[in-house]
Structures are given as structure tokens and as C-alpha cells.
């Protein structure tokens, strides 16, 4: 079953809108890609978007680009686990990375600043404990 992002047929009053046309292909969406922490190989998924462009989505990753704000340097470090995720409390148990998630890395805790399901990479900024 596909995801449709058009207007609902139901009015706030409970009545129905009578559609003047059918559903269109450009109103379709997709299920979200949930980026997982994994020891296995880095896995991405390429998706064709509007205009024939490509969007790279991270499916599995074990590394993140972490910026140290004190020194201004960026390092590629191994992700150990997801500590906190405000998007969904169950994402912590499943090790799903989203923007704003707190991840535990080799050099300490870091907050994810990129959108792995949209950007194709995991960028984070180191936080002080």
C-alpha cells in the first residue's frame, strides 16, 4: 500500500468533500527510512525524486562525522549506541538514528545535526557531560 499525501475527503464537520479529480502520482509519498546503528557494512538507498534527481538515504551505518566545538575539528568516529531519541522513545531500544538523537561514540556523547534518512550521512556535534 502506498502513502498518499493529498487532502482528506473528510471535512471537519464530518461531511465529505466530493473530489473533482483522481489521486495524482505527485501526491504520493514513501515510508520513512529508519537509519540503524550496525557493525556491518554501511548501506545506503538511492531514491529518484522530482526532476529526475537522486536522494541518498542511509539505511545502516556504524560511523558518524563528529565536530568538536572547542577545537573546531571534525572526526569520523564509531557509533556505539543510541542513548536518547526524542522523536520516539522506542527508537532507543531499536538503535534508530534521527536528527536530534543523542548517540554514544568512541569520543563521548554527540547530538545528531543531520537528517540521515534525507542527507545520506550522519553528522553530529560533541556535547559536554
From Swiss-Prot:
Record-level Gene Ontology MF annotations: structural constituent of ribosome
Keywords: Ribonucleoprotein, Ribosomal protein
InterPro entries: Ribosomal_eS8, Ribosomal_eS8_CS, Ribosomal_protein_eS8_arc, Ribosomal_Se8/biogenesis_NSA2
A GO CC annotation given for this chain: cytosolic small ribosomal subunit
CDD domains: Ribosomal_S8e
Record region (Disordered): 1-29
A Pfam cross-reference name: Ribosomal_S8e
Signal peptide: none
Domain of life: Archaea
A biological process from GO: translation
PANTHER family per the UniProt record, alphabetical: 40S RIBOSOMAL PROTEIN S8
Binding partners and assembly: Part of the 30S ribosomal subunit.
Entry's family note: Belongs to the eukaryotic ribosomal protein eS8 family.
Listed name of the protein: Small ribosomal subunit protein eS8
Source organism of this protein record: Methanocaldococcus jannaschii (strain ATCC 43067 / DSM 2661 / JAL-1 / JCM 10045 / NBRC 100440) (Methanococcus jannaschii)
